[in-house]
Each structure stands twice: as structure tokens, then as C-alpha cells.
Amino acid sequence: MPKRTDIETILVIGSGPIVIGQAAEFDYAGTQACLSLKEEGYRVILINSNPATIMTDTEIADKVYIEPISLDFVSRILRKERPDAILPTLGGQTGLNMAIELDKSGILDELGIEILGTKLDAIHKAEDRDLFRNLMYELGAPVPESDIIHSLDEAKRFVVKIGYPVIVRPAFTLGGTGGGICYNDQDLEEIVTSGLKYSPVTQCLLEKSIAGYKEIEYEVMRDAVDNAIVVCNMENVDPVGIHTGDSIVVAPTQTLSDRENQMLRNISLDIIRALKIEGGCNVQLALDPYSFNYYVIEVNPRVSRSSALASKATGYPIAKLAAKIAVGLTLDEIKNPVTGSTYACFEPALDYIVAKIPRWPFDKFESAKRNLGTQMKATGEVMALGRTFEEAMLKAVRSLETGQVHLELKHAEDNSDSWIEKRIRKAGDERLFFIGEALRRGVTIEQIHEWSAIDLFFLNKFKNIVDMEQTLADHKNDKEVLRTAKRLGFADKKIAELWDTTEEAIYAYRKEQGIIPVYKMVDTCAAEFESETPYFYGTYEEENESIKSEKPSVVVLGSGPIRIGQGVEFDYATVHSVWAIQEAGYEAIIINSNPETVSTDFSISDKLYFEPLTIEDVMHIIDLEQPIGVVVQFGGQTAINLADKLAANGVKILGTSLEDIDRAENRDKFEQALRDLNIPQPQGETAVSTVEALAIGERLGFPVLVRPSYVLGGRAMEIVYNQEELQHYMENAVEASPDHPVLVDRYLTGQEIEVDAICDGEHVLIPGIMEHIERAGVHSGDSISVYPPQKLTQYQKDTLVDYTTRLAKGLGIVGLMNIQYVISQGEVYVIEVNPRSSRTVPFLSKITNIPMANIATKAILGKSIVEQGYPTGLAPEQKGVFVKVPVFSFAKLRRVDITLGPEMKSTGEVMGKDATLEKALYKGLVAAGMEIRTEGTVLFTVSDKDKEEAIALAKRFSTVGYRIVATEGTAKAFEAAGVRTDVVGKIGAKGQTLIDLIQNGEAQLVVNTLTKGKQPARDGFRIRRESVENGVPCLTSLDTAEAMVRVIESMTFTAEEMPKAEVVH
């Protein structure tokens, strides 16, 4: 069937902001799909609320709407654009749920709009737990004993029948939100209640737990004429019971016999055919390790996290082909873009092993529960390729950037044997490293298997790694042993430790002995056909397949796995930088380790190396490619941190020089630079010990802001209010960087301003100034930011432009820079300068139409801003108002305090744009998932220092018709100021307490400002967590609450009594 000609315009629904469970893989899928549809000649309209992605660039679709993905806004766009069809299966769970809502509302029938790709009834059959079960019975596919429940009583009846443990899976949710494994009645009550709350249809599936089975996934594709193929099969190293997004995964499957593989493969193909899915689909199965029994766990009828992994693991572009299938093309008509000669109906074959390890945010959230279950907690993932399981695994560990280069714990000796057993029995983010330690202590693989249910095959491979450590230690300087160790993926750093020498010495010795990696091509067909993909991984074998090109090349370092503080914004900048390098006539080479992103799509760069971002792995590539230089400013802190080691190896750093990067990042040098330039900054000093820090605190006066130098996303940054808190901080957090001192600053309250600029060495271009709604002290990534600024005077704007221009030139910036200012009592102070691309670059580039990463890259390559045809100074302000609103994933992380502070906590962002600030804020808040009601109840619990401000807010809430509720102290203050307030009991009081109020859904909004101290057991913490678990918006900054009330005021009509005439005597 050739492609359809009866449709012209297609609306693609994006996946919205990045949250845990739905990350950059959908930006990748959506970008691929839009380009793929345009390639076939369709007119593509995109709606997505996320400004940080490549997908929402105007080149990707014919029309791009950055608007909330809500029934209201999507319907408006449908009415305005009248597309012929919509394609929802590439926008993750957001896209699917939106399609179902649109269908229910009747607008699709009314406008005659068709749904492309997988049909709605197939989506229902896969997502609705009841329909899915019935379909499996018809196919004769076994599913675990289960029951659909709508209330806690039904759940209890089911458990009486089959006993514990049971798994709870809420319907139509993402990343297992609200689900979990129950071992007893208490778990059941907690998890079922939360599951019913998070399911949009209040429905959960309870099933008999088959934890301990092998978890196998098949990524399959089918077209409209029933051709179906398996693109990739994958095996979770962790057994069933851990969400696949939190599992370590290998491809292809390692421990299945041919019979098992064929059996599971056939059922996967039967399922996709029975569901009549057109496009990609992911089938998860559980296999009993001791027999041929298996169960079908679930089916995702859409492009998913696993399909992004499968695409990168095999080189087979699933999303691109799914889009073509959606418009009627068939697998035997579509050329495989990798080989350029075979068709898409050939199943990929792998002659290497792929390992994926999730990246968790626990380094940012110390108080979070670290155990893993059916609810996903990872923010991102890394992938590595190798010729042996050991090599792929160790390369993946190095890619995580958690400071580990090997299968070992930090401070392993502090762990008792019983603690190690406990951490292996209960899955957690460090289980892999605990297994390594257990093997070193002589625990047998059979014993570890009994504790963890991880297959002996994998444990044996981990044992090979541990045995090799001993062999290396026994054979110092033996080059054959060295060669074997490198084949198992050992890092030079680890070998150096075992041989009592330095990493550099090992690297030099290997080069001299000719023990260097070769680069193999990822070609989808195990080298059966000629292939033209420039996609490589390194391994220690004979033949090198990566040929250095004739053209001069530039290497761009990517930003590694997505984590809090370093999100998809940096990938955006990386991709734009690559395009600019190509436009300037050079060959662009990318090194990155993240399978979810656009930058690791082989069609983006001239060459893609899928390797860890460590000095060893990067130097190998540079030795081979001999580029004219390396660009480090787009890869976030990951790339900046490699700069000094690269320069020490004689590599040219393009753009801002290493000395100048250091002048911006090193505190003492930075302060000196500001003094030379005569630019004011908050008073501050540097401490290298606790004693010194306490003395500085005394001198400056509290509160002070403390942080280590050289960190991203405000890691280990805190505002402390007294000596005890400062001492606690110095003793617990400063390990964040032992070689670097700690900065102690006077904490200025005031408005925070952020400026991005581009400098070519002599000219400075400032695309825009952004104003934060939350006052200084909230991390810039967690603040709502507004463009153009609404409150600045002309004098302040001029001062900001002047300081920014002087800083850019004075610090020798070439390329991008980001500066944060605070305006305290009318004066402008500099807080910090980042000599690199920042997380506001995509947002600013889109709203000002100044392609910042592109201009900066060309400036780095020697073409001035003026030569590129851009003006200097502050660009003229755009019409309208644009806001960037942070999005958090607190519902996924139990026990994390949601208070905003100097340490970043948001995982993603959305944009709202409109004619006025209030309208833009409304869209931003709605897109970020807040429900804004024009009436309801607002609960205030504020600290004494905030009472004054809170009274003014309470008055405004009351005027628009909200009921005000507060605890006794606050209520008294409100009443005294003339605000009608209902009193509610504190936690633990008799009668109705505020926790009851939140749990019963009586509050639509909670305003809770910090009570001092970071102790989680505090009442404030309980209130904030209860709000999150009950889906009530909780604002921890009065500035955000003020923004919210402005929006509500702008939506409501007033009802004021007539003024009385004054009596005249």
C-alpha cells in the first residue's frame, strides 16, 4: 500500500515536560516522526508545551504551537487548523491520554478528524486492564492471576483469595505512578489508595506477584497489511518486580535458550497482530527461570523508553518508521536508512552487546527512599556497547558520572556483611556495586542468586570482573594481562590503582604497546550488507572500521545522562552546535552516552561515537580523529569538567579558554575579576575547614548561602540561618568536592534576574533579560522566569547590559555565557557567571528568534557576531509575554521535601505565552499540571516572618471568592487584619486537622512557607508531602502564590458593593 493521498495535514501531539518516567526519549521520537512525515510531503502541525526540546523548533514542523496539552487548548488548535488527522502515539502517555480525551469530548467526530497509527480501540485494549486480560485469554496467552478493583474493599477480597505478595498497577498512568508491591495489609491500604487516586479512571489491576521471574522485552513493529517484525529483544538483569525503567537491561537477551526465545517471540508477534497495532509496540514478558512457563506482563501500544533504547541499540529508527506506517506505507516498501540498501522488513541482527543502566536522582535527594519497585524513579539512563557483557557493563558504569569507574562502592569497608546481604536482597540503585563487594568478600554466586534472583549467568560475568582485579594485582606490568583486562572493559584508572601508578602512565604504556581500541560500526545487520552509518563504539579487537575523513573536524562533547540540573536543554544546545559546525564547512563529531536524546541519533552528526564521557574514552577518539579542537561549552558541567584534563593532553579547547573558564568558576579569581571590573557582588569568603567557615559566618552575619565551587544545579547548596546549621552543613555536605573550597556568601534578599549573552571576543549580543518571579535564594532552574522583564526600571536594564558586556569582555568569553544577578534595594549585584550554555538557551532562542547556540558556535569557529549579520547589545524586546514554569516529579519520589531553595529539584519545564503576564502565567501553570480554579479553599500555614506578606495575599484570595483556612496562629493574624478565616487544627490536634482537610480533598491550594531547619519529621514537611500525595498544588514561596492569585484575579469578574456617599455637614 503506497502512502495515503487523502490526507494533507497531520497534527502531532508531543509529550510535554520532562518528568520521571517520561524523559527525552519522546523528544527524540517526536522529532524523528515530524521530520519523517515532512519527508513524505505532509503538512505537520505540532503541539507541545516543552520549550527545551529540538522538537519545538520551528524547522521541525510546518507550524509549532508551544501551548498546554490540555483538552481546552488542543481543541482550540484543532478548530483553528482543521487538520485531517492526528498522530498521538509518539507523545508518550501524555499523547495517548490526550487522544482518548479528545475522542470522548466528541470534537474529532465533529471536525471529521481521524486518528492515525494505532487505533483507539487497540489503545484501550492495551491500556485498560480488563479488556487486556480478556484479549490475552482469547489468545491463550497466560497472564498472572489478577482482578480489576475500584475500591479498597474489592482489593481486600482479592487478597483473601490468592494471598500476598500482590502487585498494584493503576490504569492509564505513566512510569507505574501510584503502584507498588504489597507484602501485608498496611502496604495494601497505602498503595491501593494512592493507586486509585493517580488513575484517571480510578481503576487498578491487582495481580499475583511473580517477582523473581526473568523479565524479557520485545520491541515489535507491524504495518497495516500485517507484516510484523521483532526489532530487538532485551533482557532485564534485574528480575520481575522492578520497573523496566529502573532496571539494568541488556540486548540481545543473554540467558534464553532458542526454544524460549522463539516461544516469547511468537507470542509477542501474536499480541501485536491481535491488537492490530500499526507502528511500534513494546511487549513485556515474565519467564519462569525453572520451566517453560511464562506470563505476559503488559503491552505499551506506543513508542516508549524501550523503543528509544532499541533504536539506539540496533540503529533501526523505530519512531521514524512508525510515522511512515501511520500514513499507510508498509515495511517492505520502506528502505532501511541505515544500510540504504535493505528494506525495513529485515530484522536487525547484533554482533555486539548493549547495556543500559538507569541514572537516579538520589545524589540530589538524600532523604528519598532508595529502594526500587514497580514505580519508576530514574531521571535518565546511559547505554554502552561492547563485544563482551563485561565490557558493555563497565563502560556503562563509567558513563553514569557518579564518580565510579568500576563495580565498587565508595567506602566499601564501612559496610558490614549483613548490610551487604540486605542491600542485595532488596533492590536499590546501588545493588550492582554491592554485588561486586560481596564477590570480593568471597560470597558465592549461588548465594547471591538466592538473595537477588539475578540469573547465575550474569553473576558469573560480574565474578569474571572481580577475578580479573586479582589477576591484575598479581601480574603488575604484564602486557598480556593488561590486554585481557581492557577487553573486559577495565578503566585505566582502576588498573592504575591495582598497579600503584597513575592513569596517565597506563595510557602511555598502552599506546607504546599498541593496546588501543578500534571502532566498530553499528549497522543493523552484523556486517552482512554494506552500510553507510557513521555510528561507532570502541572495543579492543583487530580491525578498525572508523576512517578519519579528509575534511578538518570538530569534536562536540555531549552532556551524558539526564539528571536533575542537567536536562535536555544541554542536548538541545549540542545538536544546534553540530548543525552550525556543519554549516561552517567542518565535519562534526559527537561523543555522548545517552540513548534517549536527539544528539545520539546517527543522522544528526557526521560521526557519532557512543562512548562514556571520561578522559580516557574521549582521548582515544581524539587520537584517532585529530580534530582541530573540542567544543565543551554545550555539554553542561560534564563537558566543562573534562576541559582541564583535555588541555593537559595538548587538546585545543575551542571557545572560552581554560584559564578564562577557571576565572569564572574559581571563586577567588572571579572575585578578583569583579573587583578589577568594578562590578558589585554580595560579600563572601572562601573556607577550607569547618573552623574557618564558622568564623566567616560570624563576620558576615546570618543568613549565609553556602556551596562548593564547580557544581551544576546547585548541588549541596544551602541557605543557613545560624552556627549549628552551618556546622551541620560543613560536616555533611562539603565532601561534595574535597579539592575545592567552600564558598560562604552573605545572602541578599531581592529580585533575581538572569541574562544569557553571546560574545565573540569583542562584540557582545544579549538576546534577552529574564526576570524571576521567586525572589533570590530559589535556584534559577526552579523559578518561574518571565520575558520581557515586567518590573525593571530603564536604569536597571542599562546597568544589566553594561555589567554583562563588561563581564563578557573582561572574562574573555568566546561563545555563550549565563549570568545571574540579584537586585537588592535597587542596586544590581552579580551572583554568578557560567562560562557555558545554560538551561535557558532553548527558551530564549525560541522566543527571540535568535539561534543562540548556532551564533555562539560560529563565533567559536572565528566568525564574529557582526559578520554573521546580528546586532550587538540588547536585542529589541519581542511582543507579548513569555513565561518558563518548572515541572517537578515529586509524586514519584517518596519522602522528598518539596520546598524550593538553592538546590535544584525540577526535572523539566513548560512555556506559556500570551499577550499579558496573567494569561501567559495561566497557560504556564496549566501546562505544568496545576489546576487553576476560580473558587475553592486555600490553606495557609506560614512562618512568622512571612505573616505580613501572607495577610495581603489572603485578602486577595478572599476577594476573588476563596475560602481561607489556617491554623490558629496564622488565623488570628488574618482575622485581626480583617480577613475572614476558618481555623483548622495543627497536626496531632483533636478534631479536624489540616492533614484531614488535605486528605479529604477539601483544599484546592496549600500555601506553606518553610519553618526553619531541614528536618523531614517537621510538620511543614508532612503538610507538603500530604499535598503531593493527594495531588493538591502546594506553593512554598509566597511569590509563586502571588502569581497564582494574579492569574485568578484576571479570570474572575469582581463583585464589589457600591461606595456609600460621604455625609457632608
Curated annotation (Swiss-Prot):
The large subunit is composed of 2 ATP-grasp domains that are involved in binding the 2 ATP molecules needed for carbamoyl phosphate synthesis. The N-terminal ATP-grasp domain (referred to as the carboxyphosphate synthetic component) catalyzes the ATP-dependent phosphorylation of hydrogencarbonate to carboxyphosphate and the subsequent nucleophilic attack by ammonia to form a carbamate intermediate. InterPro entries: ATP-grasp, ATP_grasp_subdomain_1, CarbamoylP_synth_lsu, CarbamoylP_synth_lsu_oligo, CarbamoylP_synth_lsu_oligo_sf, CbamoylP_synth_lsu-like_ATP-bd, CbamoylP_synth_lsu_CPSase_dom, MGS-like_dom. It catalyses: hydrogencarbonate + L-glutamine + 2 ATP + H2O = carbamoyl phosphate + L-glutamate + 2 ADP + phosphate + 2 H(+). GO terms for biological process: 'de novo' UMP biosynthetic process; glutamine metabolic process; L-arginine biosynthetic process. Mn(2+) 4 binds at residues 832, 834. Keywords: Amino-acid biosynthesis, Arginine biosynthesis, ATP-binding, Ligase, Magnesium, Manganese, Metal-binding, Nucleotide-binding, Pyrimidine biosynthesis, Repeat. It comes from the Bacteria. PANTHER family: CARBAMOYL-PHOSPHATE SYNTHASE [AMMONIA], MITOCHONDRIAL, CARBAMOYLTRANSFERASE FAMILY MEMBER. It holds the Pfam family CPSase_L_D2. ATP 1 binds at residues 129, 169, 175-176, 208, 210, 215, 241-243, 284, 298. Mg(2+) 4 binds at residues 832, 834. This is Carbamoyl phosphate synthase large chain. Residues 547-929 are annotated as: Carbamoyl phosphate synthetic domain. The gene is carB. It is an enzyme of class 6 (ligase). Binds 4 Mg(2+) or Mn(2+) ions per subunit. GO terms for molecular function: ATP binding; carbamoyl-phosphate synthase (ammonia) activity; carbamoyl-phosphate synthase (glutamine-hydrolyzing) activity; metal ion binding. Mg(2+) 2 binds at residues 298, 300. PROSITE patterns: ATP_GRASP, CPSASE_1, CPSASE_2, MGS.
